[in-house]
Amino acid sequence: MKFFIDTADVKEIRQAHDLGLVDGVTTNPSLIAKSGRKFEDVIKEITEIVDGPISAEVVSLEAAGMIREAGELAKIHKNIVIKLPMTPEGLKACAALTREGIKTNVTLIFTPMQALLAAKAGATYVSPFVGRLDDISQDGMGIIDDIKTIFDNYGYQSEIIVASVRNPVHVLNAALIGADIATIPYSVMLQLAKHPLTDSGIERFLKDWESVPK
């Protein structure tokens, strides 16, 4: 299973990369805005840190505009993946970019059928949002299971990125279902490494070591 980090905070990306956990990065306009920096500057710096897929999102709502933006983004670095919204115009742009050999990530997916449409349009990645579904009392992980079944049934090559991850349980369930990727906030990555028995075990080892004659 691959781990992407879901942030535009370059410091967090460096820290996660140093842990050996980052296979790629997902960003969006909201995350870029939080950085307070120019969009292109942030993306360029990220590509210097992580040698893997870097999702950068278009802001146009019409396919023609998305395709124009995608062309500019793709020039930044070979690892740029164009993030497109799950709309009819987004699907149109996805199909066109796929024909041009540009990788795409169709985002804001909330149903298995949306994921199926994105796969049929040739999306490199599909990004279902589990946390936001949980927020409205729907089964976020359930749609991941359904998408995985559909893709396996028909041999779609689009990779499933479990997005809107809120806690370690989301990551665990994504792994158990067999999702290709989870895109995870840095804070949740750190939680994955923690357990109170690990902490108490380290404390006990250190205490025992202090009693060893020196």
Swiss-Prot record:
Signal peptide from the UniProt entry: none
Organism annotation: Geobacter sulfurreducens (strain ATCC 51573 / DSM 12127 / PCA)
Domain of life: Bacteria
Lineage, broadest ranks: Bacteria, Pseudomonadati, Thermodesulfobacteriota, Desulfuromonadia, Geobacterales
Residues annotated as transmembrane: none
Protein name: Probable transaldolase
Keywords, ordered alphabetically: Cytoplasm, Pentose shunt, Schiff base, Transferase
One of the record's GO cellular component terms: cytoplasm
One record GO biological process: pentose-phosphate shunt
Classification via Pfam families: TAL_FSA (PF00923)
Predominant localisation class: cytoplasm
Function (record text): Transaldolase is important for the balance of metabolites in the pentose-phosphate pathway.
InterPro entries: Aldolase_TIM, TAL/FSA, Transaldolase_3B, Transaldolase_3B/F6P_aldolase, Transaldolase_AS, TSA/FSA_arc/bac
Catalytic activity: D-sedoheptulose 7-phosphate + D-glyceraldehyde 3-phosphate = D-erythrose 4-phosphate + beta-D-fructose 6-phosphate
Subcellular location: Cytoplasm
Recorded name of the encoding gene: tal
Family: Belongs to the transaldolase family. Type 3B subfamily.
Alphabetized GO MF terms: aldehyde-lyase activity; transaldolase activity
Enzyme Commission no: 2.2.1.2
Residue ranges that the Swiss-Prot or TrEMBL entry lists as coiled coil: none
This protein's pathway: Carbohydrate degradation; pentose phosphate pathway; D-glyceraldehyde 3-phosphate and beta-D-fructose 6-phosphate from D-ribose 5-phosphate and D-xylulose 5-phosphate (non-oxidative stage): step 2/3
Annotated catalytic residues: 83
